[in-house]
Structure formats: C-alpha cells, structure tokens
C-alpha cells in the first residue's frame, strides 16, 4: 500500500493545526514522524487513518483519492499514545475483536501467537485494568497487529 498526502492542511476553528504539506509513504518501509509537542503528528496520523478529514488537500492510497472515506473502509491499524482497550473484555477478547469482526478462522491460534510474540500470553484471561500501562499498550498493539492491515500507525 502506498499512502500519499497531497497538499493537506487542517484547521480547527481559527487555528491552523497542519499547514500545506505533502508526504508519501512507501510500502514495506518504516517512517518516523518527529516533532515537538503540539506539532500536529497525531492530527496527521488521524488524517492518514481516516479518523479526520483535512480542511484542504487529498489523501491518496495507491493513487486513489480516499479523502473522506470512512475509517472502516481504509484497512488501517492505529495504536494511540493513550492506548484504547475494551475495559469489560478480557485481554483475549480485546485481541480477538478485529478477527471476529472479519469472520476469521483460527482465532484462538492467532490470538495466542500474537500474545506470545508480545509476551502477554499469561494475561489472556485478565481484564486490561489488571495490567500495567506497558502491558496494556502491548494488548493494544496485539489488537492492531491482528488486523493485518497494510498500514499501521503508532502514535
């Protein structure tokens, strides 16, 4: 998947959060966004994921304009700085949720494989609130990896 931002900007009220910018991400590459606090990194990633729409400009995936396309149709995984887990669901079900939504087979094996890779297999029967912050972040990462999305954004 190739993702490109073409002359995007983002305004919220009278404030400009992102100024006219273009960016192209290459397939099978790791791209790092560095910037000061409040520089717009999260806003930029939210636009890439389809969670926000730019005020101006276009978001292109493999050359196709997907600006405004709902996040569910983008096949993008995102892990937030303030991670999000489903508090009433056990860790196993948190990781399994995207697999169940897609009707995947072998959910148990896939969840256990991801949990093992991230060293959280011993927590599968616990609720997220019973884990440390770092362990909860790994649960969020495992859920994102379970999506097997061609683009993963880590905030």
In which residue ranges do the predicted regions lie?
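ABC ATPase NBD coupling module
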Residues: 64-78, 101, 108-109
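Conserved ABC ATPase signature
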Residues: 127-131, 135
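A short, proline-enriched helix->beta-strand linker immediately N-terminal to the Walker B motif
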Residues: 146-150
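Helix-to-loop junction immediately C-terminal to a conserved catalytic motif
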Residues: 49
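Conserved ABC ATPase "signature" region
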Residues: 106-123
